[in-house]
Amino acid sequence: MSMSNMSGGSCAATRLTWWLESWCESNDPNFTAKAADVVGLYVAPPAKAIVLCVDEKPSIQALERAQGYLKLPNGRALTGQSHDYKRHGTTTLFAALEVATGKIIATHSKRRRRVEFLDFMNSVTATFPNRKLHVILDNLNTHKKNEDWLKAHPNVQFHFTPTSASWLNQVEVWFSILQGQSLSGTSFTSLKQLQEHIDAYVNAYNDRAEPFVWTKKKVRQRRFKGRRITQL
């Protein structure tokens, strides 16, 4: 017997009963200035400069899942994956999205410490020699307090999103595309196979890459009140 039958309500009412709304609220006192700085780089980038969105996608798991099908009573076959899986390790993907072209620079790492972040930034700067680089980042601790590296790279300027507002970073959109188009529902027999799979996707994506177009007219700091309904 379903819960809707037990409670005497409709399926829609039962779903609403267990509905949980969630969000991440930014309490950054400098939200407006930081958001304007980031959005300004999207809609009016400095002349002859490169704007990059940089972040990492940590702990991408190489999971090996059994593939197969289940024959249903009506004769149809239901294909899918087993709930069980075998772990083959994880990789952290560092990525830089070039705002003007939509193209991706990506590399794999075992960890995501400051040293790995700066190693990636060294490879990014080498890709654009003698160019002014504006790099959009979130507020991860490894992204902050890199004054010595910035002094050694005077052509690079970091721009930080407001706290709890990493959605302003366009590379987060690309990570979502990567997950939906390339990683969801996959199975890998080794960490190397996962990394090669991601690399092949990045290459194919860059062949057809187009820049994201910023269309939101206003970015405002929102204040929410929590609501949770659990009563039957």
What is each residue range found by the language model?
Residues M1-N27, I50, E56-A62:
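Conserved short alpha-helical interface segments
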Residues G80-Y85, A152-Q170, T186-F188:
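RNase H-like polynucleotidyl transferase catalytic core
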Residues I104, V171-S190, N206:
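Active-site proximal helix-loop segment of RNase H-like, two-metal nucleases, encompassing DDE(D)
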